[in-house]
Amino acid sequence: MDFSTVQSSLISHKIELGLVQKRQVKRMSQSTSKVNQKFEYLIVLDFESTCWDTWPPAGQNEIIEFPAVLLDLSSGNTLSEFHEYVKPTEQSILSSFCKNLTGITQEQVDAGIPLGACLCLFSSWIQKLCEQYQMSFNISVPGKHVTFATWSDWDLQICLHRECLRKQLKKPEFFNYWIDIRNFTIGLQKAWLEPCKIWAYHL
């Protein structure tokens, strides 16, 4: 889903979110735990990666665009933004399919930074925000809480996780907490459709 669409969906519903998914770094096979928790802030994240329209694909996904925004859920306001283009190193030339799908050009990724450098910049951005707004990813600590919001688990559970493993990059601990907004919107659709079904039945 488009990054701006995810963001606007969150703002329009002014969510009281729960069901944080916690993924441990060491084993992808470990179960995902869920807890009910309300948040004051969300960081909306939506990677773009290398991709192909062939099977098998010509390579593995590498992040090429790393955008994020911090949302205040009480107001719906965007408080801060982060954006970097990332230079792929395993398959440095973007496919025509990828460029058409993402709108990202070869020149943009050629001028991008390595993923490791991007993670360092992003971690610094996160640290400043946590200090500025006195927020924490640790839901066991009293105070204001924040987590990531993604469209499906692909961004953090698969794409970033696997690329960090392949490139032997240390993935920051805070990336192990996120909310799958797709599940939330599906729940909203079901809640809206159910009374419609009843109403249609009585016509």
Which functions belong to the PLM regions below?
Residues 33-40, 60-64, 70-102, 123-203:
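Metal-dependent phosphoesterase core characteristic of DEDDh/y 3'-5' exonuclease domains
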Residues 56-58:
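Short glycine-biased active-site loop of nucleotidyltransferases that positions the nucleotide triphosphate
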Residues 104-109:
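Short glycine/proline- and acidic residue-enriched helix-loop micro-motifs
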Residues 1-47, 52-53:
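N-terminal accessory regions of nucleic-acid-interacting proteins
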